[in-house]
A protein has these predicted regions:
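Recognition helices and adjacent regulatory flanks at domain boundaries
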Residues: 1-6, 19
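Conserved SAM/AdoMet-binding glycine-rich loop
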Residues: 19, 26-30, 46-126
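Short, hydrophobic alpha-helix immediately C-terminal to the catalytic nucleophile
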Residues: 22, 80, 172-175
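Short metal-coordination and nucleic-acid-contact micro-motifs, chiefly zinc-binding Cys/His arrays
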Residues: 10-13, 17
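Short, surface-exposed acidic/glycine-rich loop or hinge patches that mediate macromolecular interfaces
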Residues: 16, 102, 164-165
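Conserved Rossmann-like nucleotide-binding pocket used by diverse enzymes
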Residues: 9, 65, 158
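Radical SAM enzyme [4Fe-4S]-AdoMet core and its adjacent flexible, acidic
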Residues: 4, 12, 27-28, 32-47, ...
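Short cysteine clusters
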Residues: 17, 21-24, 259
Length: 269
């Protein structure tokens, strides 16, 4: 795929995150301590973005997703300038930002709202009494205040709620509140991740994160006793794999036509 054929970009502009979500790959074993492979210095500056993605390369881009696998958009102090650069280079480009929303000032969110063709998807997993059970280290009221400031200035905001056992009774209340606050869309989704214990800084279990009891995607529960066995279950079947990272003969490789990136003309940066 040539660059001129690319229409969608998925950008990860920060390796930093203010949240400590138990099921995030950033925090092994649902702890408070980051995976040693994470480099918190991997935060893009506006100069780096302009160098790597100059306006001439962005002019034909139609969609940009800013979503962190390990970090959150709001932890980048150049975030506003980066989004403005994308819009200036491609004014009709639709920009979607996924964030926990629990940082920056109301004024900062108002400034973000001034950028056209932008949607911010706030991760709000329940009401004030349940949200931070999963989105640890975030503040529900701060997120609501930031979303309110963003929406008040004309910003387009979505509310996405991940349904767990501890918040499944609040879906309708969250949907009602989202409507009252002016969110454009409310999305409720189940998780396909297994149950895990949330641990404090001393390694002690404070509570459990479990899928909703009516979830169609439940995979089972990881207990303290079988956690290590679950993590290494693939190693117990070496016959399924070949050396040198080669795929087993019995597992067909997808054709190029099945590649999502090629079909959607999208790349991850």
């Amino acid at each position: 795929m040539k660059w001129q054929d690319v229409k969608k970009l998925h950008l990860e502009i920060s390796a930093l995150c203010n949240a400590v979500c138990p099921q995030c790959a950033r925090y092994p074993a649902a702890s408070y301590y980051e995976h040693p492979s994470i480099k918190n210095t991997d935060v893009w500056t506006i100069d780096q973005v302009q160098q790597r993605l100059p306006a001439s390369d962005l002019k034909n881009i139609e969609h940009v997703l800013i979503n962190g696998t390990m970090g959150d958009f709001i932890t980048n102090r150049h975030a506003l300038s980066i989004v403005q650069h994308i819009h200036d280079a491609s004014p009709t480009c639709k920009i979607l930002i996924n964030t926990n929303g629990s940082a920056r000032t109301s004024r900062w969110w108002e400034e973000l709202a001034y950028i056209p063709n932008l949607t911010v998807n706030f991760a709000l997993d329940g009401l004030e009494d349940t949200h931070s059970l999963y989105r640890r280290n975030t503040n529900w009221q701060t997120i609501i205040d930031n979303a309110r400031a963003f929406i008040k200035q004309g910003g387009c905001a979505d509310w996405t709620m991940t349904i767990f056992e501890h918040n499944q009774h609040q879906v309708e209340d969250c949907q009602r509140l989202a409507r009252e606050l002016g969110f454009k869309n409310f999305w409720a989704r189940h998780t396909d991740r297994t149950s895990v214990p949330a641990r404090d800084r001393q390694g002690q279990t404070t509570h459990w994160i479990r899928p909703a009891t009516n979830s169609p995607m439940t995979l089972g529960e990881i207990t303290e006793e079988n956690m290590q066995a679950k993590e290494h279950k693939l190693i117990e079947r070496p016959d399924l794999f070949r050396s040198n990272n080669q795929v087993h003969n019995n597992i067909p490789l997808p054709s190029l036509d099945a590649c999502d990136s090629l079909r959607e003309r999208s790349i991850y940066v």
